[in-house]
Amino acid sequence: MEKLKGMKNIPINVAADLLNKSPQFIRIGLQNQRLPIGSAVKMSSQWTYHISYEMLKNYIGIDRINEYENKITE
C-alpha cells in the first residue's frame, strides 16, 4: 500500500481505521462538518468525500499514522 502522505485523498475506510470508527461515522461527520479532516460535497444525489492527509495528521497526530502504516506493512 502507498504511504498515506503520498495520497491525494485518504480513503474513507483508512480514515475509519485510523479513528477506530465506522466508515459511516466518517461520512456523516464530514457531511455535517463535525470532523476537521476534509470535506463532503453533495453532487446531485450522491456525496463525494475528500480527506486531506495534512488535516488528518493534525487531527490524530503523526504517531498514530506511523503506527497504522507499520501495522499494515507487517
Please place each PLM-identified region on the residue numbering.
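Polyanion-binding surface elements
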Residues: 1-29
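Intrinsic-disorder/low-complexity regions
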Residues: 8, 12, 31, 62-65, ...
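Major-groove DNA-recognition helix of helix-turn-helix-type DNA-binding domains
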Residues: 20-50
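A short, Lys/Arg-enriched interface patch at domain edges and termini
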Residues: 53-74
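Short, low-complexity interaction segments enriched in Ser/Thr/Pro/Gly
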Residues: 2-5, 18, 39, 52-54, ...
